[in-house]
Design a protein with these regions (language model features):
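Active-site-proximal cap/lid insertion segments
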Residues: 1-4, 120-159, 165-241
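Catalytic-site neighborhoods of secreted/periplasmic enzymes
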Residues: 39-150
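Active-site-proximal N-terminal segment of extracellular/periplasmic enzymes that hydrolyze or transfer
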Residues: 1-23, 32
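Short beta-strand segments
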Residues: 1, 27-32, 77-80, 178-185
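Short amphipathic alpha-helical segments and helix-helix/interface helices
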Residues: 15, 62-66, 168
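A short beta-strand-to-alpha-helix junction
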Residues: 11, 30, 55-61, 225-237
Length: 242
């Protein structure tokens, strides 16, 4: 997807600029799978999938932000990754001196809507990514949260970068600090401001479809193209923020 790795779907000038200033790896050997297992690998510097699945840092783990903190380097986390505040996913963020948690991604239980407008949501969203009958379901909060994300400034990843810039502005004259700016995007659902999507045309004419299923492809060709287009738009947002 990224130009620096041969992607041709869109232009990613800011990722290109970052690649020019970075070490670029042509081979990648996976450790633990993404989400919390990968984060435990990165905190502790060792592979966790050999003995445990999805879960928190253990009391015996050496966490690099904590090691920095205990050695007089100020550590700060900015993230909209809501799994940090879930049962089983916690104990990562509190290894930092401070943290700013941005709300509203995916199924983050953010906005309280006791009686959601069911018919409105059924018309607006594809049936494959909607479940409003079960408040415990993974799809329940996404349409609710999206009702409160109306402008580009409302998007959680945009708020993350603004918070990171605030940290840099506040601490530009300080030394010995570490900032971890971590966004949930481009994780699904592939929801980006309209200006990043408007140039990408598809033949799909149905309700909003931006959350692919974790299974074999059963969608029509038009639906697949719509999902791809929304993913490309989200990558474009990430490049813009970078």
């Amino acid at each position: 997807m990224l130009n620096s790795y041969g992607g041709k779907y869109l232009e990613t000038p800011n990722f290109n600029r970052l690649a020019e200033k970075s070490v670029q790896f042509n081979n990648h050997y996976i450790g633990s799978m993404p989400c919390m297992p990968a984060r435990r690998d990165m905190h502790s510097g060792r592979l966790s999938f050999l003995h445990r699945a999805w879960g928190p840092l253990e009391p015996f783990d050496n966490s690099f932000p904590e090691l920095l903190r205990l050695n007089n380097t100020y550590t700060h986390l900015v993230t909209d990754h809501y799994h940090y505040f879930e049962d089983g996913g916690a104990t990562y963020h509190n290894r930092f001196n401070s943290y700013d948690f941005i709300r509203g991604q995916e199924r983050d239980p953010w906005k309280a809507m006791v009686q959601p407008p069911l018919e409105k949501f059924r018309e607006k969203y594809h049936k494959s990514q909607l479940n409003l009958e079960n408040r415990e379901h993974v799809y329940y909060f996404y349409p609710i949260n999206s009702e409160f994300i109306k402008e580009e400034k409302d998007f959680p990843s945009v708020k993350c970068f603004n918070s990171g810039l605030d940290f840099l502005q506040t601490n530009k004259d300080a030394d010995n600090w570490f900032l971890q700016l971590e966004t949930f995007d481009p994780h699904e659902p592939f929801f980006a401001p309209e200006r990043f999507r408007e140039k990408i045309k598809t033949k799909y004419r149905g309700p909003r479809l931006d959350w692919p299923q974790y299974e074999r492809v059963t969608e029509s060709d038009e639906e697949v193209q719509e999902l791809k287009a929304n993913y490309i738009a989200l990558i474009a947002l990430c490049d813009h923020l970078l």
